[in-house]
């Protein structure tokens, strides 16, 4: 059974240590406060659970932040650093073309 819950990364409507896997696909660039929001992801991830971010860099010739004012682009390396600062371990990066994946474990 699948249950759809509406919420925000700013304050997720879930208990602590709830999920074995948390994903953020094409969303991190739009988070209002990345450091604070990563703490919220960490809170809902179980010990030993994983957090995976998948993003597309998009066309590098476009100034995305100007075109989409609520957007802040980060490199895979920046996101990996944010994850490590939050407490995720074994953070690693995989890239293919304009796509990147950053994964870490709690």
What is the predicted function of each stretch?
Residues 86-91, 95-106:
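Core SAM-dependent methyltransferase catalytic element
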Residues 70-87:
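Short alpha-helix
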Residues 1-13:
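Conserved SAM-binding strand-loop segment of SAM-dependent methyltransferases
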Residues 48-56:
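Conserved beta-strand signature within the Rossmann-like core of class I S-adenosyl-L-methionine
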Residues 10-22:
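A short acidic, Gly/Pro-enriched loop at the edge of an enzyme's catalytic core
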Residues 35-47:
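A short glycine-rich, Lys/Arg-flanked "PGG" loop and its adjoining helix->strand segment in the class I
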